[in-house]
Amino acid sequence: MKRYYYMDVLAILATIAVVFLHTSEYAFSNHTSDPHWIIAVILQVTFIWAVPIFFMMSGAHLLDYRERYNTSVFFKKRMAKVFVPFIFWSLVWYIINPFIFHKPTDYHIGQFVDAVMHDTIQPIFWFFYFIIGFYISAPLLSKITNKNDKTLSLYLLAVNMVFVNLLSYYYEIRSQTDNSFLHGVQIGAAGGVGFFVAGWYLKNTVLHKWQKNILYVAALASVVIMITLTIYLSIKRGKFVREVYDIWGLFGFVFSIGVFEFVKNHLETYRPSLKVQFVLQKVASTSLGVYVIHEFFIYFAERKLHIVDSSLKHMLILPVIVWLLSTALVLFIHKIPLLNKIV
């Protein structure tokens, strides 16, 4: 199977971006008079493409899985790679949450199952629900994504953009009830579908130079609009308007696919030396592990080292240190039999 090294680069960049997102949550405080709040907002918007990149990479890798193996093998591979770590780390966080947040311990299996089913254990684990849902949908989506005829893929993307990226986003920003058409459309209106299919499409399509230029300009414009609108509406409404840079919104979607295409366009033919290949593959392989454990380091820095979340140290230096420590730990765990299955 051909290896695309730009995918390794994307995985590494997206992992770093995730950590920057989670160390700049001071933006949620809406302390609009503090210059550090504006920096936090800029960081939040600048790195919002992190999880969408993972979604697009999954679509790019897996929507043509039938070329390599059957659906039964696909499910075995995917569920072992993601479902097992999801359950394991959900259990770990379920056990230690009372100690982190100083709550009484009251463990029982029914409570754990309910917490897993309702995503109340670890907020950042929302990613797993979408990715597992994608795996379940992949056998159907893979019948729509056809390299020889991309018409249905484009139709699916168009439906997603109209009902999710435009209409749903419009009502979300206005704090209004979502449009009823969104719930009536039976396929294509789920937020994640757009990213999964977009990743597959961009991987298998060579855009014209003018198309790339339009996409890059639109992506940059989206960043400026999201930063400006988030700051303006947050000040005006007196509460943080997170919805502006929602990844399911038009600007978040355009920005994310712009990042994907930019890296692909510049590194698609990249063939690094054997030593660099080894390093890229090793570091890229830590992405899931870093995702599930990096919050431990952030909590430690905040509660034990007393690094205030409004400080520049927390927003600019801590994420680099957390990523390096998390990556090193995951690489170590990869060497341990059985434990290497959970990261």
Annotate each language-model stretch with its function.
Residues 16-23, 90-91, 157-171, 219-234, ...:
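Aromatic-anchored segments of alpha-helical transmembrane domains
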Residues 54-55, 63, 93-102, 109-203:
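Hydrophobic alpha-helical segments with transmembrane-like composition
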Residues 60-69, 139-146, 198-208, 261-271, ...:
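Structural signal for the C-terminal ends of transmembrane alpha-helices
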Residues 242-254, 306-327:
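Membrane-interface transmembrane-helix boundary segments in multi-pass integral membrane proteins
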